[in-house]
Amino acid sequence: MTKGILGKKVGMTQIFTESGEFIPVTVIEATPNVVLQVKTVETDGYEAVQVGFDDKREVLSNKPAKGHVAKANTAPKRFIREFKNIEGLEVGAELSVEQFEAGDVVDVTGTSKGKGFQGVIKRHGQSRGPMAHGSRYHRRPGSMGPVAPNRVFKNKRLAGRMGGNRVTVQNLEIVQVILEKNVILVKGNVPGAKKSLITIKSAVKAAK
């Protein structure tokens, strides 16, 4: 069965094991998620569990949103997402960090930091041209393609807005779970800025 929870990225820190090993970790605060809807094949065409995270003021919610969360007897939520392959939950139930433990391998999804308009070297990792005075290009994209089509092909790697994309980092290890603070420490870094939404769920490609 899949484990899953929504949380917020707090930042990065470091911890030391009993043997003195230094481990960089990302701190993710995951307050209890509330199950807002249980979708089935008969009613929705597929099976999933819809959960809500992070309360927001009722003034900022419309009537349909208030009616939807009222079935779970909870406040309106800022973030609503779905998890598949989760069984045994009813509307109004809570998902907490208790389901995870140290050593679990998870996939973490977030929205990468926006970098603004960037060139091909930073955006796509292309090599720069010669930097001597005789060179006609230094950080330009280079060839646009052959002469014959007389146009630039679609999907040509060019300069543009970088970041702000949905990114998933797979097979990260949970180092520690702090129940009293609803905090999960994940080994390494995860995508996203501080206070951004993070999705944690059981790894799809974890070694069995």
UniProtKB/Swiss-Prot annotation:
GO cellular component annotations of the record: cytosolic large ribosomal subunit
InterPro entries in the cross-refs: Ribosomal_uL3, Ribosomal_uL3_bac/org-type, Ribosomal_uL3_CS, Transl_B-barrel_sf
Nucleotide-binding listed as a keyword: no
Keyword hit for Ribonucleoprotein: yes
Stretches for region Disordered: 116-148
PROSITE patterns: RIBOSOMAL_L3
Subunit organization: Part of the 50S ribosomal subunit. Forms a cluster with proteins L14 and L19.
Protein family according to the UniProt entry: Belongs to the universal ribosomal protein uL3 family.
Descriptive protein name: Large ribosomal subunit protein uL3
Organism: Streptococcus pyogenes serotype M6 (strain ATCC BAA-946 / MGAS10394)
Taxonomic placement: Bacteria, Bacillati, Bacillota, Bacilli, Lactobacillales
Gene behind this protein: rplC
